[in-house]
């Protein structure tokens, strides 16, 4: 493809990334795995250089007065780097997501249709402070035959630059083009990237709700991810208290900033008086602030919950509580206020659980367990690309299969459509092979 | 869900459609099939009424001076209506696309993950003149457990209104809510529909390229469809002339307005002098106008092709021809100018064919057969929802599986995430069942 000289540097970079992707996508499993092994080796050899660049990023961030949690995410110590490199080797050993034949059908004698797994092409991944994300994403991209254009957090610029150079140098010794892995460093480039429909096949944003929403609203490229994670737990009339308390505590407090932590607890009125006081005590011991509707306020000590609470992802040790008069009311509340992420029911009534799992319109519907299990690693996917709250697949926690698509191959021997139309039309055999 | 009185009628309609969808999605196969059978019966009983309304539409369109092809699409004669009703009965007998378990895994003892096929929710389908599309879409929607909001062509308003009433009346006698099938009648409602992200899960536009592009660019709701269909056929150095001629003629002339008809023929220079004259003669006999690059112009009588020709979907008996010096050049041309729809190679060289099928970045990659096979019915999908040229699945011709998604159900016995994290963390079993 000829690039006109008037096109921007990013345009050229994206064009070259697509060319690299077309080549990468035609490599076999061993060739892609060798490239991943070369990345692991290159990173291991360059550890001192990488850690030094990260130290510079950390020092600069500290001088700017960065918040402690962000600093911790930016900091790439030796043990974090080593375990990330070990993760690269894990990716090398994952099953190949490409080449799977999911349909193999004779349409007629000598005319055979195959649906074959193939890469998406070019991924645009925008992530925040954690520099090890660049390593993880690069190895997943190569495993799945995709080129990637990365944009890391501003604070991590030096780390990301060194990591990209090390990975590109490693790739240069393999059959994979170094142009398969690309780094953007300015915020302006994000907006331009979002307009490159002809080169970029999927955008994966990792960051705040507002950031993901901004991306979703400013691109025609498909976006894999989720803005909100407003998850619910519903304690049914037939809930078992000995399950309800530990699951509620786990779902709220085990990692409150996670998208799969609960924000609202729905409690059936039949058990509210019995359950809420011990629940409030258990949650209080973990430092959770409670906000309740009027019924809840009569039973336990809590702040009043307003309409806004039902729509809020606290990402913090805060829980809103509402008393509902039926399973139907719980389902309706979740379908209205939830973000289609993950919602659970605690009940010993299997019919109620089945109703809940069928009628709640979320990617994850859970019975008698914590919403915190909504995660690609916990599902056994090996690697997690993200969690999608869209309805169209891939939905929920997404592993490598979110980075691949398929194409239809049709192999004939001179077959033409006219043979199968009009008077005397030949019938298709449609015989699965 | 409570609807504020300030919301529009369409908002309320969409809200009610979503409620109907949640109920419809929880029905079993037999219940949904009974509703489809009731629709077929209702339509059969109401045939005189439907044909009369269609006659009115046709008379009004004729008075407005409607073009003949559009008139033919609008006209719903007795035989077309009967065969459409027969199609409804076919949908009744298709396999149920819902409820398939595509993953069933023990995460740990007593903690079982299932990925289960489920409906998308509410479909927005915007179609043109053909009133029978309303019947087809309604039956596919109910089969797949989805509600639908339909907008037909302006010319077909009377036909669509009667059809919708007949279908709703038929549904009222079943467990499916009549609110599952809805009709919009004004163009203004389309724009509002495109903004109803919270209710509508998928938009399926059927119409001109410009119309589909307009839809794609004006909604955050996923769109299933394709704007362009710029398909190619490449005659390789090792092409067999006895296959090349009939396949080229079929791919161009069998139905030139179809999206899977070819627009550009790429010819390897090694065979151009031998192949182009007989090809030009065969195409000329079918009334095809040829536009060639400079090399082509030296070999056959044709108009000059300009850069714009490589980007044009003629949808007519016009074919552009370009001579290329290698397989690589053919692949590059297709990846640059094609619309990722369907592209074919004619060659006796299997290595070249495999290279082509691997490196051409299209939903359909064909060897030694006509691109006209790109079609859900020909692929054996039973019913076609549309053809998608997006990279993310569903891609290519899409059957009922394009109207379904999945959710993850997790069934536990009090399991919490804390058990599996930190020191002394329990390992997951990840045992496929």
Curated annotation (Swiss-Prot), chains A, B:
GO biological process: L-proline biosynthetic process
UniProt pathway: Amino-acid biosynthesis; L-proline biosynthesis; L-glutamate 5-semialdehyde from L-glutamate: step 2/2
An annotated GO cellular component: cytoplasm
Keyword terms: Amino-acid biosynthesis, Cytoplasm, NADP, Oxidoreductase, Proline biosynthesis
Molecular function GO terms recorded: glutamate-5-semialdehyde dehydrogenase activity; NADP binding
Highest taxon of the lineage: Bacteria
Free-text function comment from the UniProt entry: Catalyzes the NADPH-dependent reduction of L-glutamate 5-phosphate into L-glutamate 5-semialdehyde and phosphate. The product spontaneously undergoes cyclization to form 1-pyrroline-5-carboxylate.
Catalysed conversion reaction: L-glutamate 5-semialdehyde + phosphate + NADP(+) = L-glutamyl 5-phosphate + NADPH + H(+)
Sequence similarity: Belongs to the gamma-glutamyl phosphate reductase family.
Protein name (record): Gamma-glutamyl phosphate reductase 1
Keyword NADP carried by entry: yes
PROSITE patterns documented for this protein: PROA
PANTHER family: DELTA-1-PYRROLINE-5-CARBOXYLATE SYNTHASE, GLUTAMATE SEMIALDEHYDE DEHYDROGENASE
Places the protein is found: Cytoplasm
Originating organism: Synechocystis sp. (strain ATCC 27184 / PCC 6803 / Kazusa)
């Amino acid at each position: 493809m000829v690039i006109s000289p008037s096109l921007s540097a990013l345009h050229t970079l994206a064009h070259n990334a697509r060319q690299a992707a077309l080549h990468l996508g035609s490599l076999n499993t061993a060739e892609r795995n060798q490239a991943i092994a070369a990345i692991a080796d290159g990173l291991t050899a360059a550890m001192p250089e990488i850690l030094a660049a990260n130290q510079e990023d950390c020092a600069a961030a500290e001088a700017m007065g960065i918040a402690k949690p962000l600093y911790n995410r930016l900091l790439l110590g030796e043990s974090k780097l080593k375990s990330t490199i070990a993760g690269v080797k894990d990716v090398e050993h994952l099953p190949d997501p490409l080449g799977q034949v999911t349909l193999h059908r004779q349409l007629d004698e000598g005319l055979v249709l195959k649906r074959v797994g193939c890469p998406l092409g070019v991924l645009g991944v925008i992530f925040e402070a954690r520099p090890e994300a660049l390593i993880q994403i690069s190895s997943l991209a190569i495993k799945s035959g995709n080129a990637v254009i990365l944009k890391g957090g501003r604070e991590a610029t030096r780390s990301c630059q060194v990591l990209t150079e090390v990975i590109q140098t490693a790739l240069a010794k393999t059959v994979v083009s170094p142009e398969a892995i690309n780094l953007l460093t300015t915020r302006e480039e994000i907006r331009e990237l979002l307009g490159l429909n002809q080169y970029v096949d999927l955008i994966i944003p990792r960051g705040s709700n507002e950031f993901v929403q901004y991306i979703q609203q400013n691109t025609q490229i498909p976006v894999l991810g989720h803005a909100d994670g407003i998850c619910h737990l519903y304690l049914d009339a037939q809930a078992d208290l000995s399950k309800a308390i530990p699951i509620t505590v786990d779902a709220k407090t085990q990692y409150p900033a996670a998208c799969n932590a609960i924000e609202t607890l729905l409690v059936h009125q039949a058990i509210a008086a019995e359950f809420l006081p011990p629940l409030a005590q258990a949650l209080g011991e973990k430092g959770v602030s409670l906000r309740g509707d009027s019924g809840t306020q009569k039973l336990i000590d809590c702040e009043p919950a307003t309409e806004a609470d039902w729509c809020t992802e606290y990402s913090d040790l805060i829980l809103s509580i509402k008393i509902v008069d039926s399973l139907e009311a719980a389902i309706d509340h979740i379908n209205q206020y939830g973000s289609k992420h993950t919602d659970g029911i605690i009940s010993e009534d299997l019919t109620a659980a089945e109703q809940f799992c069928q009628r709640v319109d979320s990617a994850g519907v859970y019975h008698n367990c914590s919403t915190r299990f909504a995660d690609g690693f916990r599902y056994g996917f090996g690697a997690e690309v993200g969690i999608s709250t869209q309805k169209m697949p891939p939905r929920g926690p997404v592993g490598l299969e979110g980075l691949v698509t398929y194409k239809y191959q049709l192999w004939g021997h001179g077959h033409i459509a006219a043979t199968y139309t009009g008077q005397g039309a030949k019938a298709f055999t449609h015989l699965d092979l």
